[in-house]
Amino acid sequence: MAPQKDKKPKKSTWRFHLDLTHPVEDGIFDSGNFEQFLREKVKVNGKTGNLGNVVHIERLKNKITVVSEKQFSKRYLKYLTKKYLKKNNLRDWLRVVASDKETYELRYFQISQDEDGSESED
C-alpha cells in the first residue's frame, strides 16, 4: 500500500468582472449604488450581508470586480445584476451578456427599425 500524502486544499479564488462602461457613461446607471446593492444582497453561507473576508467587491470606475475565496457562481452574479436592473426599471433597455469566461457586460438591446413593414397595410 502506498503511503498517504498530506493533502492540503488548494487556495483557489473565483474572480468575476462586470463591465458597466456604456450605461454609466450615458448616465442611466449608478455604479456606486449597484456596488452597495451587491454588498447587501450577496449570500454567503445562506445569509445576506455576511461577506466577511470571503467575498470582496471592488469598483474601479466603470468595472466591478467580485473576488471570492469560497465557491461563487457566475450565474448568481448575473441573477443579482438582473434583479438590480428590474428594481431600477432598466431591464427593458439593458441586458447582461457574457463577453468572456470571467466577464459580464451590460449592453443595450438592439432594436431594429423596420419602417417598410409597418402595420398600416390596407
Curated annotation (Swiss-Prot):
The gene is Rpl22l1. Belongs to the eukaryotic ribosomal protein eL22 family. It comes from Mus musculus. GO terms for cellular component: cytosol; ribonucleoprotein complex; ribosome. One of its GO terms (biological process) is translation. The keyword Methyltransferase does not apply. It comes from the Eukaryota. InterPro entries: Ribosomal_eL22, Ribosomal_eL22_sf. This is Ribosomal protein eL22-like 1. One of its GO terms (molecular function) is structural constituent of ribosome. Keywords: Phosphoprotein, Ribonucleoprotein, Ribosomal protein. Pfam families: Ribosomal_L22e (PF01776). PANTHER family: 60S RIBOSOMAL PROTEIN L22, RIBOSOMAL PROTEIN EL22-LIKE. The modification Phosphoserine is found at residues 112, 118, 120.
